[in-house]
């Protein structure tokens, strides 16, 4: 049972948000060239309980025949088609301020840093979609949902940035500074 927090995004911030126990054992699954960077970035935010790493990254895990999981992902164009049919429940994983500024009409806001407190909002049977601004946070959210037993969702590749270019109903944009 693992979660994925990608090294290329706001890695340290989301490790701190999503793994509250700094003594949690951590196994690093990263490309060999990124191992030292991963260790340094974890250490900078107090996570020093790294129990190991996979020598050749994810491929080592695959070669050993260990269990893996993945999530279904769809393009913004595929999302547009599903949205227009009214077939999916939609969750916006962005911060409340981002959601308040503009979101897809009908989306339910569950910020990533609050996902564990709001798991009951995610349906266990009906299919749903998740998105964030660009795809990084929704990938983390998806890995958490998968870890907790959800398999009935899709992640929208490119997040709201990609969705906003489609013919999908959105709320009118409100500059966040005008909401102060």
Name each region found by the language model:
Residues 1-89, 93-180:
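Rhodanese-like catalytic fold shared by cysteine-dependent sulfurtransferases
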């Amino acid at each position: 049972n693992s979660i994925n927090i990608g090294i290329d995004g706001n890695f340290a911030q989301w490790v701190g948000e999503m793994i509250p126990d700094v003594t949690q054992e951590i196994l690093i699954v990263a490309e060999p060239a990124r191992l030292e960077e991963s260790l340094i970035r974890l250490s900078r935010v107090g996570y020093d309980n790294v129990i190991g790493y996979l020598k050749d990254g994810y491929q080592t895990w695959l070669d050993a025949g260990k269990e893996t999981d993945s999530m279904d992902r769809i393009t913004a164009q595929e999302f547009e088609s599903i949205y227009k049919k009214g077939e999916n429940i939609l969750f916006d994983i962005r911060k409340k301020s981002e959601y308040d500024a503009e979101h897809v009409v009908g989306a339910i806001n569950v910020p990533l840093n609050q996902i564990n407190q709001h798991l009951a909002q995610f349906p266990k049977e009906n299919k749903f979609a998740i998105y964030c601004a660009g795809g990084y946070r929704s990938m983390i959210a998806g890995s958490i949902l998968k870890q907790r037993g959800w398999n009935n969702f899709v992640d929208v590749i490119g997040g709201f940035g990609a969705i906003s270019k489609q013919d999908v109903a959105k709320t009118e944009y409100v500059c966040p500074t005008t909401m102060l």
